[in-house]
Amino acid sequence: MGPRGLQLLAVLLALGLCAPAGAQKPSACQCSRIEASHRKNCGFPGISASECFNTGCCFDSRVPNVPWCFHPLPKQESEQCVMEVAARKNCGYPGISPQECASRNCCFSDTIRNVPWCFFPILNQDCHY
């Protein structure tokens, strides 16, 4: 194999290692509920929408001077519970159990400290992407 072939092989291997296996296209709520100023880059300059989605990221080129290919918000049990941490409105009390939170028809996520773990859901109607 010549030098060009080795270069191509190296690029293909690098791209294959960067893309998560079986990456799933994020939901509309995971992409549209993140403030443009909070986007974390997930691609490279000139990435296409399909390349971006194939890595499991969101793509939106309507906002200038922010990443167009960006990491989605974390997946939740319900789309109504997908939101930025700053958007959470407390629906419980410190130490509330997931079961008690669910009995209040609220969302529960204890993965981030010092924020409400039991919080009110958001209507899916505002998911536009």
Curated annotation (Swiss-Prot):
Modification sites for Pyrrolidone carboxylic acid: 24
GO molecular function: CXCR4 chemokine receptor binding
Organism encoding this protein: Canis lupus familiaris (Dog)
Chain's role: Inhibits gastrointestinal motility and gastric acid secretion. Could function as a structural component of gastric mucus, possibly by stabilizing glycoproteins in the mucus gel through interactions with carbohydrate side chains.
Biological process, per Gene Ontology: chemokine-mediated signaling pathway; maintenance of gastrointestinal epithelium; negative regulation of gastric acid secretion
InterPro entries in UniProt: P_trefoil_chordata, P_trefoil_CS, P_trefoil_dom, P_trefoil_dom_sf
Signal peptide: 1-23
PROSITE patterns assigned to the protein according to its UniProt record, in alphabetical order: P_TREFOIL_1 (PS00025), P_TREFOIL_2 (PS51448)
A GO cellular-component term linked to this record: extracellular space
P-type domain span: 29-73, 79-122
Disulfide bonds: 29-127, 31-58, 42-57, 52-69, 81-107, 91-106, 101-118
Taxonomic superkingdom: Eukaryota
Gene designation per UniProt: TFF2
Keywords from the UniProt entry: Disulfide bond, Pyrrolidone carboxylic acid, Repeat, Secreted, Signal
Pfam families (UniProt xref): Trefoil
UniProt subcellular location: Secreted
Keyword GTP-binding: no
Protein name: Trefoil factor 2
